[in-house]
């Protein structure tokens, strides 16, 4: 029988799985407030380079990492003695990474995911991938064991967090005490980072994943020079699509009006440095999928997520014309102007 753990005020010893931009900036934030923090990376050479330079030049350039931040490639050492694990691995690589690490994960240690995406092969959310790989979903105690899982999501551009610019996020878990402890761990004595709590882990993860597809569409609008009116319409109707599917999948409607829904969508669609929007801008400017991907340093989660969302929309019978249009532009080579025209000429209806 799974033992329920009630959490105290803050976590003290944290390992971050993933050495990308978000993993690095969260390591910076935690070290600045005195939390013992280490980062594990899949690529030993890349991790050693980050440790040597005290800078993640590939994913978070221009920001020196604290000398207190540790780096560990050894699987067992990275996960020994920790009281919280942060999963910061791109969605399509999560299963591979956690299959490697699972034998070193203590059954009492909670895991918070900062990954945004939906797995292509299974259509699972990040917390569901963790539950499946770590064995949470193999018996009737699934719901109880899910109380070890949480999600931290919201409009959190890594470069801005590194510069201590004001930002907000949401800590979501079925276990409210875990959500609150994560909230205090990341927010207490950090005046530029405010974390709220939520128990709608389904809505928080779906909103964080699907907004990346709409961000690609926003970039396409920018690249094609379609104007601000078109972009405003895109964000509004894009959020409506996200909400429709989310509700069908069990999310709470109000989640999509909050930080992880509207908030994250706006930031991702307007930020000049956002990967998904910038990728879309290249597509709108005439590049094909492969060209735009090769020009982008980091993983563009919205590309893979687009495939997953189209499949989910079909499964749940939800109309998602913008997402479908993005899919056709990316994978069927549909010309951007024709895609825009087809969206504008859809059957007229009430809002």
Residue ranges of model-derived segments:
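Acidic, Ala/Val/Gly-enriched low-complexity intrinsically disordered segments
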Residues: 5-8, 140-142
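NAD(P)+-binding Rossmann beta1-loop-alpha1 motif at the extreme N-terminus of oxidoreductases
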Residues: 10-63, 70-73, 100
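Rossmann-like NAD(P)(H) cofactor-binding subdomain of soluble oxidoreductases
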Residues: 65, 71, 75-80, 84-166, ...
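Alpha-helix C-terminal capping/helix-to-coil transition sites in glycosyltransferase folds
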Residues: 80-81, 210, 262
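Internal alpha-helical scaffold of NAD(P)-dependent oxidoreductase catalytic cores
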Residues: 93, 104, 129, 136, ...
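NAD(P)-dependent Rossmann-like dehydrogenase/reductase catalytic/cofactor-binding core
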Residues: 218-222, 247-257, 261-351
């Amino acid at each position: 029988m799974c033992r329920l753990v009630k959490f105290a005020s803050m976590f003290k010893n944290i390992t971050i799985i993933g050495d990308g931009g978000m993993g690095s900036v969260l390591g910076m934030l935690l070290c600045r407030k005195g939390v013992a923090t280490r980062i594990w990376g899949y690529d030993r050479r890349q991790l050693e380079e980050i440790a040597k330079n005290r800078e993640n030049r590939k994913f978070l350039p221009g920001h020196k990492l604290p000398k207190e931040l540790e780096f560990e490639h050894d699987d067992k050492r990275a996960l020994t003695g920790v009281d919280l694990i942060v999963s910061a691995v791109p969605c399509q690589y999560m299963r591979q990474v956690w299959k490697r690490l699972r034998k070193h994960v203590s059954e009492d240690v909670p895991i918070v995911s900062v990954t945004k995406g939906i797995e292509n092969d299974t259509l699972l959310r990040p917390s569901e991938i963790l539950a499946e790989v770590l064995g949470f979903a193999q018996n009737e105690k699934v719901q109880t064991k899910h109380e070890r899982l949480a999600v931290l999501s919201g409009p959190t551009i890594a470069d801005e967090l590194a510069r201590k610019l004001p930002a907000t996020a949401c800590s979501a878990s079925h276990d409210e005490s875990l959500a609150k402890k994560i909230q205090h761990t990341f927010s207490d004595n950090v005046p530029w980072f405010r974390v709220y709590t939520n128990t709608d882990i389904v809505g928080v993860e779906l909103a964080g994943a699907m907004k990346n597809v709409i961000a690609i569409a926003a970039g396409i609008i920018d690249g094609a020079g379609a104007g601000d009116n078109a972009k405003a319409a895109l964000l509004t109707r894009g959020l409506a699509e996200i909400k429709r599917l989310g509700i069908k999948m069990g999310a709470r409607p109000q989640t999509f009006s909050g930080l992880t829904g509207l908030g994250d969508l706006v930031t991702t669609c307007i930020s000049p440095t956002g990967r998904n929007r910038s990728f879309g801008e290249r597509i709108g400017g005439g590049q094909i999928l492969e060209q735009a991907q090769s020009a982008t340093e980091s993983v563009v989660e919205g590309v893979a997520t687009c495939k997953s969302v189209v499949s989910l929309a079909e499964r749940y019978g939800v109309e998602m014309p913008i997402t479908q249009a993005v899919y056709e532009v990316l994978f069927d080579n549909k010309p951007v102007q024709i895609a825009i025209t087809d969206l504008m000429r859809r059957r007229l209806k009430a809002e």
